[in-house]
Amino acid sequence: MKKTTQRTESPSTPDLASIARRIREIRGFDLTQGEFAKILGISQAQLSKYELGQSTPTVEILLRLKKFSGRSIDWILTGE
């Protein structure tokens, strides 16, 4: 008999789709991905991964997002 394990997210697991939405919100409509990536010091491809929820931003990037937006890291990660 095959044993099935149910995978649950721990409270510390980031919700990448929500983080992605908030990063897009921080970038806004005034900046292209390329422009915003340059401000953050990353490639446009990496910013795209963050904005699509395919990658979790590093602490360094979270700090840069905080500095750029004036939003807390808690807000970027949780929306609160």
Segments the model singles out, each with a brief description of its role:
Residues 30, 56-59:
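Residue at a beta-strand N-cap/secondary-structure junction
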Residues 23, 36-37, 47-50, 76:
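Conserved hydrophobic/aromatic packing and binding residues within compact polymer-binding modules
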Residues 79:
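Conserved short acidic donor-positioning loop in nucleotide-sugar-dependent glycosyltransferases
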Residues 1-29:
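A short, Lys/Arg-rich alpha-helix, primarily the initiator
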Residues 60-75:
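DNA major-groove recognition helix of helix-turn-helix/homeodomain DNA-binding modules
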Residues 41-57:
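Recognition helix of helix-turn-helix/homeodomain-like DNA-binding domains
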Residues 20-39, 64:
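Short basic helix-loop element that most often maps to the first helix and adjoining turn
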